[in-house]
């Protein structure tokens, strides 16, 4: 019986951790989208295409870095 309790607590704990991580990733994605929207608005005002390209490359490198580091 004690083994079942420990297993249940472990499963619940891991589930809470994964939910917490998912919420954090969701917030980060929303923040990135807001930043991208601000950059797009700034680009529409005439800042040029070079900043848009740099922003795209930076975003891609950020996602690749997160995937490699697992963060």
From Swiss-Prot:
Proregion residues excised on maturation: 23-54
Signal sequence extent: 1-22
PTM section of the record: Frenatin 2.3S is not amidated.
Molecular function, one GO term: DNA binding
InterPro entries hit by this protein: Frog_antimicrobial_propeptide (IPR004275)
Record's compositionally biased regions (Basic and acidic residues): 44-55
Keywords for the protein's UniProt record, in alphabetical order: Amidation, Amphibian defense peptide, Antibiotic, Antimicrobial, Antiviral protein, Cleavage on pair of basic residues, DNA-binding, Immunity, Innate immunity, Pharmaceutical, Secreted, Signal
Comp. bias regions, Acidic residues: 28-43
Entry keyword annotation includes Hydrolase: no
One GO term (biological process): defense response to bacterium
Family from the record: Belongs to the frog skin active peptide (FSAP) family. Frenatin subfamily.
UniProt-recorded name of the protein: Frenatin 2.3S
Organism whose genome encodes this protein: Sphaenorhynchus lacteus (Orinoco lime treefrog)
Source lineage: Eukaryota, Metazoa, Chordata, Craniata, Vertebrata
């Amino acid at each position: 019986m004690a083994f079942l309790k420990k297993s249940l607590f472990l499963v619940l704990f891991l589930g809470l951790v994964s939910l917490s991580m998912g919420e954090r990733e969701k917030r980060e994605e929303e923040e990135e989208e807001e930043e991208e929207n601000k950059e797009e608005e700034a680009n529409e005002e005439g800042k040029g295409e070079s900043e848009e390209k740099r922003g795209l490359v930076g975003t891609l490198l950020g996602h690749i870095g997160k995937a490699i580091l697992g963060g």
